[in-house]
Amino acid sequence: VGMDFGLKHFLNLDDGSVIDSPQWYKASLNELRTAHRAVSRCQKGSNNRNRAIRNLGRVYQRISNRRRDWFFKLANQLVGEYAIICIEDLNIDGMKRLWGRKISDLAFAEFVSILEWVASNTDTTVVKIDRWAPSSKVCHVCGTINASLSLKQRIWECECCHTTLDRDTNAAINIRRMGLAQLKSA
């Protein structure tokens, strides 16, 4: 299966299905705000401040645990369904500069490491595609490259074969095709 990571949907699979992220950090922002406020209102060095800091740490730990649990469940589901999983090698640091908190909340790198670990315990193969491969801009039907495709265009029509393509599904199909080609050549 080919998988394309995204901001709107966590994963886009090559069959057109999408997997959304629960966005644990975003869901816990009010709780975090309250915990941070409690720390800032306490006097430095006091026992109440130490207690508030421990409480704040627990909130962050709970977010991390929820995200990690969801990643393991998703990785086990994907490994159970597919024998070969093709993903792209993402530039996480570059994405963090552009989208900040959203990328940190999605934690793509953590999911990829969990997916690789779960796959190593089974017969599933994880293939990483080069991050500079034009997965979104290539038509999966005829292979024409759409150089003028911008990030805002979510659906586009191929100039050569006139196929209407969803950007993310098309990228997932191209990732699967490139991953299988990379696997055959190795």
Residue ranges and their predicted role:
Residues 1-186:
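Positively charged, helix-rich recognition surfaces that bind polyanionic ligands
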